[in-house]
């Protein structure tokens, strides 16, 4: 069941899943992409906007050691663009 517009939900993103797949020196950038994909999939959103706080938390310990999991607060809103409804998910630290 998708998140309703205006509703806030807290997700725990399992960043640990990418650690075996991605080389050490690509982990933090790939973790940001993973958070974006995870939220888009679970919130059924076409666009995902990640706050700078989430980005800084991922990069806090450098490029090689992102956190194993991250609790994020997701708020979904709908916009009209050219007559089509677009779901946008805003991601912030929980």
UniProtKB/Swiss-Prot annotation:
InterPro entries given in the database record: Ribosomal_eL31, Ribosomal_eL31_CS, Ribosomal_eL31_dom_sf
GO molecular function: structural constituent of ribosome
Gene3D superfamilies: 3.10.440.10
One GO cellular component term noted in the UniProt record for this chain: cytosolic large ribosomal subunit
Keyword Protein transport: no
Pfam families assigned to the protein according to its UniProt record, in alphabetical order: Ribosomal_L31e
GO biological process, one term: cytoplasmic translation
Swiss-Prot/TrEMBL keywords: Ribonucleoprotein, Ribosomal protein
Domain of life: Archaea
PROSITE patterns the record matches: RIBOSOMAL_L31E (PS01144)
Family: Belongs to the eukaryotic ribosomal protein eL31 family.
UniProt xrefs under NCBIfam families: PRK01192.1-1 (NF002258)
Protein name: Large ribosomal subunit protein eL31
Organism: Pyrococcus abyssi (strain GE5 / Orsay)
Recorded name of the encoding gene: rpl31e
């Amino acid at each position: 069941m998708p998140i309703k517009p205006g509703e806030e939900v807290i997700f725990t993103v399992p960043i640990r899943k990418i650690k075996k797949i991605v080389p050490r020196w690509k982990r933090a950038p790939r973790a940001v992409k993973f958070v974006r994909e995870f939220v888009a999939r679970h919130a059924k959103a076409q666009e995902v906007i990640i706050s700078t706080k989430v980005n800084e938390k991922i990069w806090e310990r450098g490029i090689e050691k992102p956190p194993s999991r991250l609790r994020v607060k997701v708020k979904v809103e709908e916009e009209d663009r050219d007559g089509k409804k677009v779901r946008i998910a805003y991601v912030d630290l929980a």
